[in-house]
């Protein structure tokens, strides 16, 4: 444990094109091997595709998708005696957004479309409509927490 306490939170940059922190975080999640321009092109193309398909602001569509994917509760492993319990705990603030973005990008990569921007666009559109693998992951997480509710008193 560090003696100086937890590291301070760094401010999140605002995206230059959409003026949104969420888009900036999404670019960071798509980023691989430090190729930020490639990640930006993927995200911007996906968001423009969302605009064409829905006819609405893509940032609003992204926020709606994240609200549908963001978990309210998750499970953490806690070792008590010789047994390991899955203890349900509520997800606080930025962790929910981080998990939602991670799941959105992760399940977009697993899709069958040819290019990454198509996959990301379709996953965002599915999530904004309450469909898709990322929304299913959230439901599974909530089910897991519900089934382990008996261990909630082991919370720390």
Swiss-Prot record:
The entry's keywords: Ribonucleoprotein, Ribosomal protein, RNA-binding, rRNA-binding, tRNA-binding
NAD listed as a keyword: no
Pfam family, one: Ribosomal_S7
A single GO cellular-component term on record: small ribosomal subunit
Domain of life: Bacteria
GO BP, sorted A to Z: translation
UniProt key word Lyase: no
GO terms of molecular function: rRNA binding; structural constituent of ribosome; tRNA binding
Subunit-level organization: Part of the 30S ribosomal subunit. Contacts proteins S9 and S11.
Similarity comment: family membership: Belongs to the universal ribosomal protein uS7 family.
Role summary: One of the primary rRNA binding proteins, it binds directly to 16S rRNA where it nucleates assembly of the head domain of the 30S subunit. Is located at the subunit interface close to the decoding center, probably blocks exit of the E-site tRNA.
Protein name as it appears in the record: Small ribosomal subunit protein uS7
